[in-house]
Amino acid sequence: MKSLFLLVLGNTEVSLIPGISVAGATPELTKYTPPADAEYLFYDKPKIIDAIPVTPEGHPTPAIITKAARELANFPILVVRGGTYLAPKVPHVHISSIVGRDFRREPALPEAGEIIERAKLLGQELERSGIEELVIGESTPGGTTTAQAILWALGYEGKTSSASPNNPQELKRRVIEEGFRRAGIEFGGLKGNSLEALRQFGDPMMATVVGLSLGFKGDVVLAGGTQMLAVAAILKGLGEDLSRFMIATTRWVVEDKSATFIKTAREIGIISYAADLDFSKSEFKGLRDYEKGYVKEGVGAGGATWLAVKAGFSPEDVVRKVEELYRKLIS
């Protein structure tokens, strides 16, 4: 089966709220995370900043897992700029440079319809090219908060994960409730109106992935954790049959006690795969800490591992390759 891995980049002002995102060493650095993640897949290190994206405690971006899987299985990667502050310095498809707004103050993405339409065209062209399966990953700091807002607006009681072991659920709840007050809705208030939920609370990554999924009629693997649950919920709300979709994530997301991945996936009605990666024996603390709940997923790590497994490699092979890449990074 001919598969293509897409990495969709997105930013939202929500990532600038202190304490909400650890997908960058500081809130300000989250602006650089999506392009830097994309660049690291192609170069030894990013061009846009002189280091790979890390959490404030120094844990490496999950892009290292995606890069490892790709070095093993050699699948093609296409970078898509859904809507970011900065363009990546790698070849990419430009959908928009629109960044999601802070939904506490204003609608997050009034341009959602326009982004979906453009991404849909790209999905249609990819279908014409003979590709049978899209595996779509994302890099979107703050995206678990926009995802949780969407799920709640659509009436799903889901709790999304976080790249931190201390999932800021209380802060997320306050931020979302403020957004709901601004929009004049309550929990489940936009049930049956996916597009309005996306306009009010979403981010450009979600709109791009929705458009790609509508335009491409083959199999789609939504390669992300709880953020892709929001995408699946929107697609379901738009009347899309989810039987050709699957979510591929990592076991760290599935095992996250502070989130509700399996329960919410079941409610939405989408099947899932969890990459069985294990860094507990790693010689590097930055990787061992994934087992303590740091990072968990992103940049399509679960989906990339799934492609490597389909190509005959084991999760252990991916882990070994990650170690090798990490050693290179810190030497």
Swiss-Prot record:
It holds the Pfam family DBI_PRT. Disulfide bonds: none annotated. It comes from Pyrococcus furiosus (strain ATCC 43587 / DSM 3638 / JCM 8422 / Vc1). GO terms for molecular function: nicotinate-nucleotide-dimethylbenzimidazole phosphoribosyltransferase activity. It comes from the Archaea. Gene3D superfamilies: 3.40.50.10210. NCBIfam families: nicotinate mononucleotide-dependent phosphoribosyltransferase CobT, PRK04447.1-1, PRK04447.1-5. This is UPF0284 protein PF0303. Belongs to the UPF0284 family.
